[in-house]
Amino acid sequence: MTSLQLSIVHRLPQNYRWSAGFAGSKVEPIPQNGPCGDNSLVALKLLSPDGDNAWSVMYKLSQALSDIEVPCSVLECEGEPCLFVNRQDEFAATCRLKNFGVAIAEPFSNYNPF
């Protein structure tokens, strides 16, 4: 197993779903008051590196997840490459990425800062 040093990802706060007729190739955000069913997706966005190099890093991360049979897709979201995984696979995906040497940025709040 290789590692990707200095790669940091964070989970985008919104949930997504496949666009009708575009499963695997196009996503749309789920409204905040909408139901998050079993088919909802989470997006992991790369914080570093950025630019053209980000796409190759995201494809390597996608391959790392494919190696453990976690389905995922690398698609553009908010102008950046994002890795989309099924919501029920989020913990397996982040565990695999951590084992692969990727740092996962976690949100902080005033109520639970650490």
Swiss-Prot record:
Q: Which InterPro entries match?
A: Uncharacterised_YejG
Identify the domain of life: Bacteria
Q: Can you name this protein?
A: Uncharacterized protein YejG
Taxonomic lineage from the root: Bacteria, Pseudomonadati, Pseudomonadota, Gammaproteobacteria, Enterobacterales
